[in-house]
């Protein structure tokens, strides 16, 4: 019987560079209030969001990804031709096939890199990071580009008081490559499909295609609404506050890291109240820098963690070599948490 030759990858993997792209247009809460009965004070108190970025016609999922990836490659000092795989996490690329990752890989100038999309909602970056780590250690790619990108403004119902203010657009990317020491810890991830209805698309694409007005939601003028993201806010809040803090602690335990050892906490930027509650539950020391990028970026789903990471490093609130806990959670419901060394 023939034996398969063992793969030869790196001993460990690490994040080597990070980049972000935020669309030019900044949208304050006042714009959101044009179509919902609310107030700037209420939006800020409930979510922490003051502004968000919305993409223009030329700021496509691919275009934003290329911009963020170029910055990540420059930060890592790696030429695109050395990228062996491109992993894109998104829920807002509307073409079912081909994967947008293939276009991004080509536009960046990779040398026929493997390229594919994944859909894991707001946990997508963590899923992509886990896949990238596995590829580097297994040996199927020396360097992997992981991208979280969203145009959630395309999936926002501006007449839905519960969600109209939440979502923003943008792209974040990291380069994952070989390391001689552990720099991406074990991933604690999973799903709770029994809660799938708590965050979902209002109408499936097949129902929207049929166009039976009697079964489709209508706007205030009687027009059929484009499918949008909806959520049961209180149910999601309770799940995130009580269950995701447990997952975050499990990730710390798996990495052999205590809260006192942490330098930075980068949770998915879903809601500032969720973030603050997790900090309290985890009993994080005051010296731990906590990402609150949501204030000016909004909830960008799969892009939120790399965007927040990029901003912390750019502003000096976090430093290269810092130990950071990252956790994403969202539609599915799904989650992924790990401890990383910042690039």
Swiss-Prot record:
Where is this chain's protein located in or outside the cell? Cytoplasm
- What keywords is this UniProt entry annotated with? Acyltransferase, Cytoplasm, Fatty acid biosynthesis, Fatty acid metabolism, Lipid biosynthesis, Lipid metabolism, Multifunctional enzyme, Transferase
Residues forming the catalytic site: 122, 268, 299
Identify the enzyme class.
transferase
Taking the record's annotation, the residue ranges forming a coiled coil are none
Describe which pathway this protein belongs to, using the record's wording.
Lipid metabolism; fatty acid biosynthesis
This protein's superkingdom?
Bacteria
Broad class of the protein's primary localization: cytoplasm
| A GO molecular-function annotation | 3-oxoacyl-[acyl-carrier-protein] synthase activity
Give the record's GO biological process terms. Answer: fatty acid biosynthetic process
**Any one GO CC term of the record:** cytoplasm
Annotated EC: 2.3.1.180
Question: What reaction does this enzyme carry out catalytically?
Answer: malonyl-[ACP] + acetyl-CoA + H(+) = 3-oxobutanoyl-[ACP] + CO2 + CoA
Task: Give me the ranges of the annotated region ACP-binding.
Answer: 269-273
Q: What is the UniProt domain comment for this protein?
A: The last Arg residue of the ACP-binding site is essential for the weak association between ACP/AcpP and FabH.
Its family?
A: Belongs to the thiolase-like superfamily. FabH family.
Q: What does this protein do?
A: Essential enzyme that catalyzes the condensation reaction of fatty acid synthesis by the addition to an acyl acceptor of two carbons from malonyl-ACP. Catalyzes the first condensation reaction which initiates fatty acid synthesis and may therefore play a role in governing the total rate of fatty acid production. Possesses both acetoacetyl-ACP synthase and acetyl transacylase activities. Its substrate specificity determines the biosynthesis of branched-chain of fatty acids.
How it assembles, according to the record, is: Homodimer.
Q: What is this protein called?
A: Beta-ketoacyl-[acyl-carrier-protein] synthase III 1
Originating organism: Streptomyces coelicolor (strain ATCC BAA-471 / A3(2) / M145)
Which gene underlies this protein? Answer: fabH1
